[in-house]
């Protein structure tokens, strides 16, 4: 019974949470008011958690059950994407072909257009026939005057056009007597009476290259017409009739002394009639003008070249130039050449870039030593358009917008094909741009968490690994190409290094990390940079050049910190011996001084954990040697003077303080203690600093030597009131 109540409560709770008007705030408020105490709220919370777990399990179960369907759907989407890509290329090619057809060649339509017209009329006539004639590209001749398949409108095609007219129109046999006549356009029309705009009859118009045939419709015989009138285009005028509903889509034909008004099926067909009539009339007028000019041109007698009287001239000079004409012929009738443009379209659509470039190489090899007559030039123009499309696709493959997860090897396919197409420079530019985007993305995706040194390790690993992979892939892809590509790679590497240094400096120097942390981070970066030497690429000098300002700033900043700390200790100086209290503390100090390079520190220690030195001098020694060690890790030649001047400024603060105290102190015991500290500073610390600097830099520092020599003046004349500056 309790179980049943629990199930009903759970189902009721589920329905309540699933309702469209559920409001969490109102629900919690009502629940708090209705609950007796904490126990009811705990039980309700358990029910909600159980419902959440049940929902999660159901969700997992449904996802698992539909997992295979998800995979199939993703595969189908991939197939659909490929097919749409292929269809897009085919449509683009068809659009280019249609746009390349010159309208001026409309009147010179081929016989294939007439055959298409007859087929459209037999299929039902009317608008269907018109659309078929207008839509077929084979209806229009090519620029050379030939049809699409290469054959011109011969006598057989013209006869076939007139035969089609005879089969459909009664009483037009006399058209056979007109040679060179062919069909341009045809369609159904409705004739109206000119005065009262009353419908007269249905007619069919046949526009030919020199005349317009009007035939009336025979209702008893489907698809047949009777000859009505024939109007030469020379004396025919076409006038557009303004729409005046319900009379619309009309145009008028003026033939002196009569006129006729026809109505088209719709505005589109009316516009086609007007355009085709004007174009055909214009073409006929141009044709007859050329004929008149040719007829009027004077024809002089053929020039006969006198026979040369050169006795040394060979008889072969009089031979005809037939061999030269034969040399101009190139056999383009092979099937693979005829189908080459279409095959290239298929390869591009199917992303078979290698196959497309193989076809281009095959064609170039075939035409390598052959002349370039017009057919070859036409073929190359068609192929060049495909090369442009292929190049655009390959460029898109290398664009940064594409996925960058594949690494440098993912670009090898597109790069290699661009190189084969002779576009090595573009391939190099796109490859490096793609890798720059990949490196930038990888750096941005790094999470800044934890210690700075940990982030720098990750940053160096990601960047230098990407740079190394890019360099190796570049060497593989562009081996044997123009050496200018390698110069471009060096420029790119410097740009990428600038991107790395920006991220490096922002995390290390802008965040004001300690000098020891900065030194360790720079050391890690240098170690990774040296790995590039395995492939002959040394970018260490670029790292130095890009980091020099940041390191100078860090050295100046840390120098100011040491100087301020030293001045603060000097202001509280009491010139007392150090008491370390425990042997352990004394032993630790000895180890620290030994690590600083002070090997004779034992002579300054006394009994019972006493040290015969001031706390200020000991602290200064440790801080100065620590600064020098960390600075030497950052050292490179451009930082020589910065580091040296910083050391001199730090040492001068301590030297001037000891000098001033020695001159101002009146107590003999304290004065002796100050002299002991001065001796330690001048004879132990300064030589150690000078020696360590020379070891780290590789050459002695004259400024440090001059500073140590100047300190001797203090010991020679200790009663002087002049301070060393």
Curated annotation (Swiss-Prot):
It comes from Bos taurus. The lineage of its organism: Eukaryota, Metazoa, Chordata, Craniata, Vertebrata. The keyword Phosphoprotein applies. Belongs to the EXO84 family. Residues 182-282 form the PH domain. Residues 312-322 have a biased composition (Acidic residues). The exocyst complex is composed of EXOC1, EXOC2, EXOC3, EXOC4, EXOC5, EXOC6, EXOC7 and EXOC8. Interacts (via PH domain) with GTP-bound RALA and RALB. Interacts with SH3BP1; required for the localization of both SH3BP1 and the exocyst to the leading edge of migrating cells. GO terms for cellular component: exocyst; growth cone; late endosome; perinuclear region of cytoplasm. PROSITE patterns: PH_DOMAIN (PS50003). The modification Phosphoserine is found at residue 19. SUPFAM superfamilies: Cullin repeat-like (SSF74788), PH domain-like (SSF50729). This is Exocyst complex component 8. Its main location: cytoplasm. Gene3D superfamilies: Exo84p, C-terminal helical domain, Exo84p, N-terminal helical domain, Pleckstrin-homology domain (PH domain)/Phosphotyrosine-binding domain (PTB). Residues 116-159, 285-322 are annotated as: Disordered. Component of the exocyst complex involved in the docking of exocytic vesicles with fusion sites on the plasma membrane. The keyword Ligase does not apply. Keywords: Cell projection, Cytoplasm, Exocytosis, Phosphoprotein, Protein transport, Transport. Pfam families: Exo84_C, VPS51_Exo84_N. InterPro entries: Cullin_repeat-like_dom_sf, Exo84, Exo84_C, Exo84_C_1, Exo84_C_2, PH-like_dom_sf, PH_domain. It is found in: Cytoplasm; Cytoplasm, Perinuclear region; Cell projection, Growth cone; Cell projection.
């Amino acid at each position: 019974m309790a179980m049943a109540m629990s199930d009903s409560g759970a189902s009721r709770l589920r329905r309540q949470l699933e309702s469209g008007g559920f409001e969490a705030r109102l629900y919690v408020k009502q629940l708090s008011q209705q609950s007796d105490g904490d126990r009811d709220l705990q039980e309700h919370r358990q029910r909600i958690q159980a419902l959440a777990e049940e929902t999660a399990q159901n969700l997992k179960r449904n996802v698992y059950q539909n997992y295979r369907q998800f995979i199939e759907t993703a595969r189908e989407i991939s197939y659909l994407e490929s097919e749409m890509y292929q269809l897009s290329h085919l449509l683009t090619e068809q659009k280019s072909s249609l746009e390349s057809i010159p309208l001026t060649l409309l009147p010179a339509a081929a016989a294939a257009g007439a055959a298409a017209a007859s087929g459209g009329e037999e299929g039902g006539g009317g608008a269907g026939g018109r659309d078929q004639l207008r839509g077929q590209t084979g209806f229009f001749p090519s620029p050379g005057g030939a049809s699409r398949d290469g054959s011109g409108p011969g006598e057989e095609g013209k006869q076939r056009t007139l035969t089609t007219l005879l089969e459909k129109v009664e009483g037009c046999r006399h058209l056979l007597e007109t040679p060179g006549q062919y069909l341009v356009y045809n369609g159904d029309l409705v004739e109206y009476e000119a005065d009262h705009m009353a419908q007269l009859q249905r007619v069919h118009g046949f526009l030919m290259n020199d005349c317009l045939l009007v035939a009336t419709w025979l209702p008893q015989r489907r698809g047949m017409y009777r000859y009505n009138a024939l109007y030469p285009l020379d004396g025919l005028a076409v006038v557009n009739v303004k729409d005046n509903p319900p009379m619309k889509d009309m145009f008028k034909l003026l033939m002196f002394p009569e006129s006729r008004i026809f109505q088209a099926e719709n505005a589109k067909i009316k516009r086609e009639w007007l355009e085709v009539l004007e174009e055909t009339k214009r073409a006929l007028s141009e044709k007859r003008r050329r004929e008149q000019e040719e007829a009027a041109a004077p024809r002089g007698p053929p020039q006969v070249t006198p026979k040369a009287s050169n006795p040394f001239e060979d008889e072969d000079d009089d031979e005809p130039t037939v061999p030269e004409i034969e040399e101009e012929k190139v056999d383009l009738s092979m099937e693979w050449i005829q189908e080459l443009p279409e095959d290239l379209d298929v390869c591009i659509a199917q992303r078979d870039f290698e196959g497309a470039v193989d076809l281009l190489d095959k064609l170039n090899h075939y035409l390598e030593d052959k002349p370039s007559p017009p057919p070859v030039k036409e073929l190359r123009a068609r192929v060049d358009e495909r090369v442009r499309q292929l190049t655009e696709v390959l460029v898109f493959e290398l664009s940064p917008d594409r996925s960058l997860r594949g690494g440098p090897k993912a670009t090898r396919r597109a790069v290699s094909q661009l190189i084969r197409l002779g576009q090595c420079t573009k391939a190099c530019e796109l490859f490096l741009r793609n890798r720059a985007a990949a490196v930038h993305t990888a750096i941005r995706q790094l999470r800044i968490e934890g210690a700075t040194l940990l982030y720098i390790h990750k940053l160096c690993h990601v960047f230098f690994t990407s740079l190394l992979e890019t360099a190796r892939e570049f060497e593989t892809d562009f081996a044997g190409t123009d050496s200018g590509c390698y110069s471009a790679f060096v420029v790119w590497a410097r740009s990428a290094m600038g991107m790395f240094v920006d991220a490096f400096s922002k995390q290390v120097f802008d965040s004001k990390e300690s000098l020891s942390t900065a030194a360790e981070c720079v050391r890690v970066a240098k170690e990774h940079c040296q790995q590039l030497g395995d492939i002959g690429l040394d970018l260490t000098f670029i790292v130095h050049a890009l980091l020099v300002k940041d390191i100078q700033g860090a050295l100046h900043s840390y120098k100011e910190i040491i100087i301020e700390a030293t001045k603060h200790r000097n202001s509280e100086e009491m010139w007392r011996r150090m008491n370390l209290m425990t042997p352990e503390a004394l032993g630790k100090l000895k180890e620290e001084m030994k690590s600083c390079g002070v090997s004779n520190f034992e002579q300054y220690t006394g009994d019972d954990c006493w040290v015969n030195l001031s706390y200020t001098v000991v602290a200064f020694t440790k801080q100065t040697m620590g600064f020098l060690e960390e600075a030497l890790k950052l050292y490179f030649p451009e930082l020589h003077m910065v580091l040296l001047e910083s050391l001199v400024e730090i040492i001068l603060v301590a030297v001037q303080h000891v000098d001033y105290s020695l001159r101002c102190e009146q107590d003999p015991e304290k004065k002796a203690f100050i002299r002991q500290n001065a001796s330690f500073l001048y004879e132990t610390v300064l030589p150690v600093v000078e020696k360590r600097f020379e070891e780290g830099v590789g050459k002695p520092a004259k400024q440090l030597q001059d500073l140590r020599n100047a300190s001797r003046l203090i010991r020679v004349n200790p009663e002087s009131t002049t301070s060393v500056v």
